[in-house]
Amino acid sequence: MTLWINGDWITGQGERRRKTNPVSAEILWQGNDANAAQVAEACQAARAAFPRWARQPFTARQAIVQKFAALLEAHKADLTEVIARETGKPRWEAATEVTAMINKIAISIKAYHARTGEQKSELVDGAATLRHRPHGVLAVFGPYNFPGHLPNGHIVSALLAGNTLIFKPSELTPWTGETVIKLWERAGLPAGVLNLVQGGRETGQALSSLDDLDGLLFTGSASTGYQLHRQLSGQPEKILALEMGGNNPLIIEDVANIDAAVHLTLQSAFITAGQRCTCARRLLVKQGAQVDAFLARLVDVAGRLQPGRWDDDPQSFIGGLISAQAAQHVMEAWRQREALGGRTLLASRKVKEGTSLLTPGIIELTGVADVPDEEVFGPLLNVWRYAHFDEAIRLANNTRFGLSCGLVSTDRAQFEQLLLEARAGIVNWNKPLTGAASTAPFGGVGASGNHRPSAWYAADYCAWPMASLESPELTLPATLSPGLDFSRREAV
């Protein structure tokens, strides 16, 4: 029984599915997808639960969310292992994901009050009050790269605001989704407030096409995000929050400290085996002998990165990709760029056939035409050389995406120029592109999405503002508008 609908665990009636470890092929989870009728049933349960949940005092909703946080802390080691085994990422990184889930809850509670709480302004004859109300029934689509942390950012904020939810994890991480939902169950969520439907494309399409849905919160690829946007077009009454991918540029202008610049580049491009939406995909380096030394050192250090199993001891910096198919896709993208005329600086290599273990690849594309503007979700870094900083910014903006952008430079003026001219939601200076804070907005523009799914800014799309002018009594104004005559006529 792998679906949780209206407080009950039930068996899916859709396609049979199993999840294996992407390196060892060990079977981790087996179950059936939700079919269209079960997806509709989950929505009906959420709709029925909404009025009572929305009317709960905020303190009651907060208490359940805080109990969930305590359960995350108590089961941190278990959830860490589930995430690591299912995604293939090293244990150390899976542990940081669970920590981020825990920390995000306190921040989300503060964000609710700061961004969507109640604000009152006194007027001469009453008050003006701003309140926020939940949308209703929302769908949450989770990604596979951070299957606990990223859906958590949507779910916690939406529940605090008083919404009820249907959660569909990625079909590549059903075990993590189920494990997290079981903690919510133990936290005491009332039946129907949060529902779990497992499945792939068919389940997702059934969920996003429901008429009774008030909105959809999505983290994932641009292609799926665009499909959802088209599906919900012409329905302005539904909230649609999209956090999608990026073809992110990292500009290396000044490499006086070569090892520091190499470390920042490795963290930007290859952490999580390149499976972060903010990862650097394009490395823009200034022409000259200094950058030649930097690239040589980058190739040297990156060439020593050996992806390992989730439980290797000592632990590796990167693990496997989400699947052997994902690793193959990265290899094909590298070969495609070679065929276009790219010069390989570091060749990607499969550590073992049939697994998702893939070493990083670096390829130079200076002067190469017709390079696809796409997000290759894995450890592949494309290099371009530029002559001057204005050209670097032009290259950085030469993408339909607009998620993250970074600059390595000692010149503050260059960073100020980048802030003015970069088309990206995240612009970092001498910091990895993959660095983010839950108290800051996370997201981008263009093909990278619209709203900002972080703990702080998620509050914005989980509730709508209601403005009120209020007075405890009704009185006639002392001064009337022109043309109004309230004088009393004497009876004849």
Swiss-Prot record:
Gene Ontology molecular-function annotations: succinylglutamate-semialdehyde dehydrogenase activity
This enzyme's EC code(s): 1.2.1.71
PROSITE patterns associated with the record: ALDEHYDE_DEHYDR_CYS (PS00070), ALDEHYDE_DEHYDR_GLU (PS00687)
Sorted UniProt keywords: Arginine metabolism, NAD, Oxidoreductase
Class of this enzyme: oxidoreductase
Gene Ontology BP annotations: arginine catabolic process to glutamate; arginine catabolic process to succinate
Cleaved signal peptide residues: none
Superkingdom of the source species: Bacteria
Reaction catalysed by this enzyme: N-succinyl-L-glutamate 5-semialdehyde + NAD(+) + H2O = N-succinyl-L-glutamate + NADH + 2 H(+)
Residues bound to NAD(+): 220-225
Keyword set includes Iron: no
Positions of the catalytic residues: 243, 277
Gene3D superfamilies with a match to the protein in the record: Aldehyde Dehydrogenase, Chain A, domain 1, Aldehyde Dehydrogenase, Chain A, domain 2
Keyword set includes Transmembrane helix: no
Pathway: Amino-acid degradation; L-arginine degradation via AST pathway; L-glutamate and succinate from L-arginine: step 4/5
HAMAP family: Aldedh_AstD (MF_01174)
Function field: Catalyzes the NAD-dependent reduction of succinylglutamate semialdehyde into succinylglutamate.
Family: Belongs to the aldehyde dehydrogenase family. AstD subfamily.
NCBIfam families assigned to the protein according to its UniProt record, in alphabetical order: arg_catab_astD, PRK09457.1
PANTHER family: ALDEHYDE DEHYDROGENASE-RELATED
Protein name: N-succinylglutamate 5-semialdehyde dehydrogenase
Lineage per the UniProt record: Bacteria, Pseudomonadati, Pseudomonadota, Gammaproteobacteria, Enterobacterales
